[in-house]
């Protein structure tokens, strides 16, 4: 069962909290427990009590029976009910038990079939007028309700927080923004120029105005001279860079023609458009190295594809196997004939370890039982340089 106020029967909620009367101990809301009195149970201290306990504690109990007598309407209803019971008991005394049960059922049916009292039009209008005349408190606004809820939750009320100012997005294009910035800078320069005559006027009022004028003339001459020197310096740097660029292009073209001659191509058909020219910011050595790398890669591709490679003359001496045998290892990195772990002379090659060389002891120690069974080995004999006869 939901807990309700003993005085107004309202439910206890978050906003309607439950309080207890210090005298009678019943549960009341804050509105019904608005009286204060000295309570003997609490050591004759001022406590919150209900209206009934406040009346008893302040005025004292009265022995007058008329004060506690029920209303007159209640007395009349009780008297009519007692008279009806007496008449029914006197009438039912002459009936049997079955007849009394039937009579009670008939009386109950008659009570149920009686038409209920319908209020008249005047009563309904009076009740509506009374409801309209009731004084209603002001309805709190949304802002007040949000502030109260924030206070209950322990937060800062929204009305006290500073809201950030709304800044509209900039819908201007980049060209418009640049133009506006230039206009702003022009206006600032104009303001600065307007402020300069005041300073010159203050200098004219000085007794040493002749010296000030000469100093200003000298400073202007020095500024113009420095601008001229800077202009000539920039022109000289541009000429040097242009000359370096031309020299670099000529060197790249010469290298490309030499490579074309080595390939057996016509060097007159080689142009700078066939190669990626370096940027002007690159160093000359870096650019040459990059172009050389590009040309070398192209030559390697041509050699791999067999395009435009001259045929090698067939050797006729007996030393051909030895030379062919020496060209392969010397073209690539020469293999070192010792163990890859202890640098002792290698005796076998392990195919399961990407062809690494081992001595017998390091091979046993570096392989477990599974590797010894799975890895295939072959004896290794270091290559010796052949002698021509």
UniProtKB/Swiss-Prot annotation:
CDD domains, from UniProt? Bbox1_ANCHR-like, FYVE_ZFY19
GO MF? phosphatidylinositol-3-phosphate binding; zinc ion binding
Q: Give residue numbers for sequence motif MIM1-A.
A: 99-112
One Pfam family of this chain: FYVE
* Comp. bias (Polar residues): 214-226
Indicate which residues the UniProt annotation says bind Zn(2+) 2: 21, 24, 50, 53
| Signal found in the keyword field | no
Motif (MIM1-B) on chain: 252-265
In residue numbers, where are the FYVE-type zinc fingers?
A: 1-58
Please give the residue ranges the record annotates as the region Disordered: 158-177, 204-227
Q: Which PROSITE patterns match?
A: ZF_FYVE
Renumbered to this chain, the Low complexity biased-composition regions fall at 167-177
Q: What is the effect of changing residue 64 to S?
A: In strain: FVB/N
- Keywords, comma-separated and alphabetical: Cell cycle, Cell division, Coiled coil, Cytoplasm, Cytoskeleton, Isopeptide bond, Lipid-binding, Metal-binding, Phosphoprotein, Ubl conjugation, Zinc, Zinc-finger
For this record, an example GO cellular component is: cleavage furrow
Listed SUPFAM superfamilies: B-box zinc-binding domain, FYVE/PHD zinc finger
Cross-link Glycyl lysine isopeptide (Lys-Gly) (interchain with G-Cter in SUMO2) mapped to chain? 132
> How is the quaternary structure described?
Interacts (via MIM1-B) with VPS4A; interaction takes place at the midbody ring following cytokinesis checkpoint activation.
| Swiss-Prot/TrEMBL domain comment | The FYVE-type zinc finger mediates binding to phosphatidylinositol-3-phosphate (PtdIns(3)P).
What does the function comment of this entry state?
Key regulator of abscission step in cytokinesis: part of the cytokinesis checkpoint, a process required to delay abscission to prevent both premature resolution of intercellular chromosome bridges and accumulation of DNA damage. Together with CHMP4C, required to retain abscission-competent VPS4 (VPS4A and/or VPS4B) at the midbody ring until abscission checkpoint signaling is terminated at late cytokinesis. Deactivation of AURKB results in dephosphorylation of CHMP4C followed by its dissociation from ZFYVE19/ANCHR and VPS4 and subsequent abscission.
Give the protein name, as stated in the record.
Abscission/NoCut checkpoint regulator
Which organism's genome codes for this protein? Answer: Mus musculus (Mouse)
Instruction: List the taxonomic lineage.
Output: Eukaryota, Metazoa, Chordata, Craniata, Vertebrata
């Amino acid at each position: 069962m939901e807990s309700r106020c003993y005085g107004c029967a309202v439910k206890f909620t978050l906003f309607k909290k439950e309080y207890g009367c210090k005298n009678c101990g019943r549960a009341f809301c804050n509105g019904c427990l608005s009286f204060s009195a000295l309570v003997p149970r609490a050591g004759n201290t001022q406590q919150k009590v209900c209206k009934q306990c406040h009346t008893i504690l302040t005025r004292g109990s009265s022995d007058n029976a008329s004060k506690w007598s029920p209303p007159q309407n209640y007395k009349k209803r009780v008297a009519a009910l007692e008279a009806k019971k007496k008449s029914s008991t006197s009438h039912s005394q002459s009936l049997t038990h079955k007849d009394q049960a039937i009579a009670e059922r008939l009386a109950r049916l008659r009570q149920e079939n009686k038409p209920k009292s319908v209020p008249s039009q005047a009563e309904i209008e009076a009740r509506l007028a009374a409801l309209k005349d009731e004084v209603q408190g002001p309805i709190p606004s949304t802002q007040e309700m949000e502030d109260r809820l924030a206070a209950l939750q322990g937060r800062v009320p929204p009305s006290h927080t500073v809201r950030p100012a709304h800044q509209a997005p900039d819908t201007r294009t980049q060209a418009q923004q640049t133009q506006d910035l230039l206009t702003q800078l022009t206006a600032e320069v104009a303001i600065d120029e307007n402020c300069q005559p005041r300073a010159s006027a203050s200098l004219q009022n000085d007794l040493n105005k002749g010296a000030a004028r000469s100093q200003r003339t000298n400073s202007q001459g020095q500024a113009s001279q420095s601008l001229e020197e800077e202009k000539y310096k920039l022109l000289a740097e541009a000429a040097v860079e242009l000359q370096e660029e031309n020299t670099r292009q000529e060197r790249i073209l010469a290298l490309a023609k030499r490579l074309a001659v080595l390939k057996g191509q016509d060097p007159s058909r080689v142009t700078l458009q066939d190669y990626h020219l370096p940027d002007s910011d690159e160093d000359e050595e870096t650019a040459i190295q990059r172009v050389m790398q590009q040309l070398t890669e192209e030559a390697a591709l041509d050699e791999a594809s067999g395009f435009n490679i001259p045929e090698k003359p067939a050797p006729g001496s007996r030393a051909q196997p030895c030379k062919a045998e020496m060209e392969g290892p010397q073209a690539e990195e020469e293999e070192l004939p010792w163990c890859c772990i202890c640098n002792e002379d290698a005796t076998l090659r392990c195919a399961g370890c990407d062809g690494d060389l081992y001595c017998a002891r390091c091979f046993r120690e570096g392989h477990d039982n599974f590797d010894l069974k799975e890895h295939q080995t072959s004896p290794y004999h270091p290559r010796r340089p052949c002698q021509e006869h």
